[in-house]
Amino acid sequence: MSYRMFDYLVPNVNFFGPNAISVVGERCKLLGGKKALLVTDKGLRAIKDGAVDKTLTHLREAGIDVVVFDGVEPNPKDTNVRDGLEVFRKEHCDIIVTVGGGSPHDCGKGIGIAATHEGDLYSYAGIETLTNPLPPIVAVNTTAGTASEVTRHCVLTNTKTKVKFVIVSWRNLPSVSINDPLLMLGKPAPLTAATGMDALTHAVEAYISKDANPVTDAAAIQAIRLIARNLRQAVALGSNLKARENMAYASLLAGMAFNNANLGYVHAMAHQLGGLYDMPHGVANAVLLPHVARYNLIANPEKFADIAEFMGENTDGLSTMDAAELAIHAIARLSADIGIPQHLRDLGVKEADFPYMAEMALKDGNAFSNPRKGNEKEIAEIFRQAF
């Protein structure tokens, strides 16, 4: 087998496993941190002896001063970044610790960008637009889904235009990522379901991406297998540590895959739903994934047939196209089994917005690695099929 040249980016240091949170203080110290801005949301901060309290304890034990910014919203806004930056500067912080899922991680990256780059954040939307080093970021992850703790992506919402934009740069990579499955125990079933489908979408889109390579394929394949075998159990019983560990590992692998292979139309379209309707990102991905998969099927039926097998479908004796169809059914069945809404109409979406969302989706950075090139009419039709 011959290989074309490819690069592969991951954070400098990654810690995984029960009690991994215990290293957060010493790692901040090794990075030269003296005063940390802990970025999180009000819900996580309110949990007694939860991830935020544990992080604070370990930071203080290591001699790190901490100030907490808990103003992060779901689908983090540019205004959240502005407010966090004000605290970062006022308190003279020199390191950022993010605690939570994708929203705190992306907001923390945004604060780091704003602290080191002039101008409007939106002006940096795109790939490798950042020119200055960010403050060190230590990402403590609490959900199995977005994998922002291991990626170069910073996804924010422009509150003026209600458009989600992505800043993709190796400078966004956290210096340290921490995945402690014990911090994920007991998460609500709807959150577990949505973030789990986000992870599956990462793995599937990375696997079929035009930018996929052998390393990203290996990570995506294992992620798909683990999610197919463990997501239902994690949703059904939040205290199932084995299922939580496997989902955390799957999310990590899927993140490492799409961090390098990029994504596709599911994310490009989901970003429009998140920006316009503030729809939870994982839910948007889950509703769209089967429909975008059907659209992409003819572009790479062999890989979709593989996905069917990875998800436990019996493809013996089937043609490649018939086996590929099973992948779509397996994805849709998993989503339904864990209680994800199946139609955009059930989520308050308006058909009148489809043309605009289709136009914006094709401008999203994730669209360019999709295996099949579409137009606005086709993307609007996918929205209608999901409606």
Swiss-Prot record:
EC numbers: 1.1.1.202
Regulation of its function: Inhibited by the metal chelator 1,10-phenanthroline.
Matching CDD domains: PDDH
Keyword NAD: yes
Reaction(s) catalysed by this chain's protein: propane-1,3-diol + NAD(+) = 3-hydroxypropanal + NADH + H(+)
GO molecular function: 1,3-propanediol dehydrogenase activity; alcohol dehydrogenase (NAD+) activity; metal ion binding
SUBUNIT field: Homooctamer.
Protein name from the UniProt record: 1,3-propanediol dehydrogenase
Organism: Citrobacter freundii
Underlying gene: dhaT
